[in-house]
């Protein structure tokens, strides 16, 4: 089975903010970035296409010619809960952040998720796809989702997740047995 993972294009917010599941705007360069993704996907025929329901993914899927993608909550970005749209500098002064910064794999953000939580929901979704019998699929999602999918495929360990977040507009092909 082949899975094409597509990360949304650049977001139009200041660097250094935890934005997770917040529906943030895309940069004015969206069309140029999206055109590059569209060219990469050109010629591929997918058995099924999914998208995170967040606008930054849906808009890219639409631009690339997939207006009828199935929206899937399990491929949303990690939830930073109460920390959504706060700067990392601001979070470092939150007394609850020490535990998270020391063990972000297992400790959730307040009212949010841990990386393990996100990995669990993404891996359940990928298990369903594997069991479906589909041969070639495409998923428009987020950096954290693409990273979790690559961990699922055995490319690296969850501890290495933040070292391997793909760039905006990246297309990654995974081959699963």
Spans of features found by a protein language model:
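Short, hydrophobic/glycine-enriched beta-strand segments
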Residues: 2-8, 139-140
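Active-site signature of alpha/beta-hydrolase-fold catalytic machinery across serine-
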Residues: 63, 148-152
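Phosphate-handling substructures
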Residues: 64-121
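Domain-level recognition of soluble alpha/beta enzyme cores
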Residues: 156-177
């Amino acid at each position: 089975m082949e899975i094409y993972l597509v990360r949304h294009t650049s977001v139009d917010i200041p660097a250094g903010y935890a934005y997770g599941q917040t529906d943030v705007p895309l940069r004015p360069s969206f069309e140029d970035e999206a055109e590059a993704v569209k060219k990469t996907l050109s010629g591929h025929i997918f058995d099924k296409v999914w998208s995170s329901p967040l606008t930054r993914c849906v808009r890219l899927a639409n631009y690339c010619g997939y207006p009828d993608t199935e929206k899937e909550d399990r491929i949303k970005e990690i939830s930073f809960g109460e920390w959504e749209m706060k700067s990392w500098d601001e979070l470092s002064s939150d007394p609850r952040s020490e535990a998270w910064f020391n063990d972000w794999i297992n400790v959730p953000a307040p009212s949010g998720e841990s990386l393990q939580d996100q990995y669990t929901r993404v891996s359940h979704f990928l298990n369903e796809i594997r069991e479906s019998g589909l041969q070639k699929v495409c998923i428009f999602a987020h950096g954290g989702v693409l990273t979790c999918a690559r961990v699922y495929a055995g490319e690296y360990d969850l501890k290495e997740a933040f070292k391997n977040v793909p760039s905006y507009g990246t297309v990654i092909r995974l081959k699963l047995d």
